[in-house]
Design a protein with these regions (language model features):
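Extracellular/virion structural assembly segments
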Residues: 1-220
Length: 220
């Protein structure tokens, strides 16, 4: 049991993907906006479920204390607990076999270029991705993205997939030829930035004193 358990049993999960930006208002009333290019790490605030029996979750408290705000854990949303899959479900029109036929050509800036020349059973109007679909390179690639606009199959051998943040080149990872993961199969590497304490109340129930705040760790 671990952070994954907290997520799987969450009452709610709040997502923060805001870019680093500042606003100022001039004396003439004009709003000026300045943004800084960065990796836009995922941040999550997880409200833990009440009513856990302490005797059943002692190993969870031990693991949370071990992780502290030091160690990273790889987590998913909707794979370990299918009840959360509605958050991450893939909404494009490809089936699993077709997704497995897609390979990566390159990633650069805000675009992921995918090779679809081997994908069978599609037409030029097949919806490959819908806005909000989650996508990640397969294997040991660490960073997930969301698609920002609808992508059709078209007639070429590649498709350009617009993504929510600048593509992250992971050290030691070969992008060209890699497969992709979509939907509930993507993962995040997260660390606690705020770790609540816990207490045991009458009846033997476990209560957390606050929400868990998690941040994506970007090492590249």
């Amino acid at each position: 049991m671990s952070l994954q358990t907290i997520i799987d049993n969450a009452v709610s999960i709040e997502f923060n993907r805001r870019k680093l930006a500042g606003q100022s208002v001039s004396r003439s009333g004009q709003i000026k906006i300045a943004s800084v290019a960065n990796n836009v790490p995922w941040q999550m605030t997880v409200e833990p479920r009440p009513g856990m029996r302490y005797a059943d979750y002692r190993d969870l408290t031990e693991e949370i204390d071990r992780l502290d705000r030091i160690f990273i854990e790889v987590v998913d949303i909707g794979n370990t607990n299918p009840g959360l899959a509605y958050i991450t479900n893939y909404q494009g029109q490809c089936n699993t076999a077709q997704i497995n036929q897609i390979t990566v050509s390159s990633g650069n800036a805000l675009t992921l270029t995918l090779n679809v020349s081997s994908v069978t059973g599609t037409t030029s109007s097949t919806i490959m991705f819908e806005p909000g679909d989650f996508v990640q390179l397969s294997g040991n690639y660490k960073y997930p993205y969301t698609v920002t606009s609808r992508v059709l199959r078209g007639s070429g051998t590649t498709i350009a997939v617009p993504i929510n943040r600048p593509f992250i080149d992971q050290a030691g990872y070969t992008e060209a030829g890699a497969g992709i993961l979509v939907g509930k199969n993507v993962t995040w590497q997260m660390v606690m930035t705020k770790q609540p304490s816990y207490r045991v109340v009458p009846g033997g129930f476990l209560e957390w004193t606050d929400n868990f705040e998690l941040a994506e760790v970007i090492e590249d």
